[in-house]
Amino acid sequence: MDKGNRKKVGLLGGNFNPIHHAHLMMADQVAQQMNLDKVLLMPENIPPHVDEKETISAKHRVKMLELAIKENPRLGLELIEIERGGKSYSYDTLKLLTEANPDTDYYFIIGSDMVEYLPKWYKIDELLKLVTFIALRRKDTISKSPYPVTWLDAPLLPISSTMLREMFAKNIEPTYFLPQNVIDYIKTEKLYKKR
């Protein structure tokens, strides 16, 4: 197929427990700076990491993502890992996506802190044939890797989902850290309350 007719789609994977403005800003900046057709936020079913963390149901995480991105036409959702179930390995996901969408070039967005772990990723050499890695540079990060990585400069917000869950557990509303409609959903559904 003619390279000019190919779609350029970014993927930002994560637990999104909950989604917040740092995730959204990263996805939107990559979409604009790389001139992508869309960036899809891709919630993982079960993270493959050793430090498995407790997460809320996929239903709630997907609903929060839908609320967070509904006003931005550059962002969308990719639910393949939720639908597939089991552990979420990037290689398995990208193999399925590239087979299902042969006219699409995928750009996998990672934080600069993940670049040093690329050698440990499952089937990294095969994954590199399927995707282009995009990393957002932090001031304190050395921008080099033995793997091909496209580095972008974008402001990064020091917000973490862990911090937000702790705030909700203490009954502190994290106004301005995540979209208000997501805060309202979390409060209505009583998510992240101490048991």
From Swiss-Prot:
Pathway-wise, it operates in: Cofactor biosynthesis; NAD(+) biosynthesis; deamido-NAD(+) from nicotinate D-ribonucleotide: step 1/1
Q: What EC number(s) would the UniProt record show?
A: 2.7.7.18
Any one GO MF term held by the record is: nicotinate-nucleotide adenylyltransferase activity
For whether the record's keyword set contains ATP-binding, the answer is yes
What Gene3D superfamilies is this protein classified in?
HUPs
What keywords are assigned to this protein?
ATP-binding, NAD, Nucleotide-binding, Nucleotidyltransferase, Pyridine nucleotide biosynthesis, Transferase
One Pfam family here: CTP_transf_like
Q: Which residues form a coiled coil?
A: none
The protein's annotated catalytic reaction(s) are: nicotinate beta-D-ribonucleotide + ATP + H(+) = deamido-NAD(+) + diphosphate
GO biological processes: NAD biosynthetic process
Name the protein family: Belongs to the NadD family.
Matching NCBIfam families: cyt_tran_rel, nicotinate (nicotinamide) nucleotide adenylyltransferase, PRK00071.1-3, PRK00071.1-4
What this chain does, per the entry, is described as:
Catalyzes the reversible adenylation of nicotinate mononucleotide (NaMN) to nicotinic acid adenine dinucleotide (NaAD).
- Matches recorded under PANTHER family: NICOTINATE-NUCLEOTIDE ADENYLYLTRANSFERASE-RELATED (PTHR39321), PHOSPHOPANTETHEINE ADENYLYLTRANSFERASE (PTHR39321:SF3)
Please identify the protein, giving its name as recorded: Probable nicotinate-nucleotide adenylyltransferase
Report the source organism.
Lactococcus lactis subsp. lactis (strain IL1403)
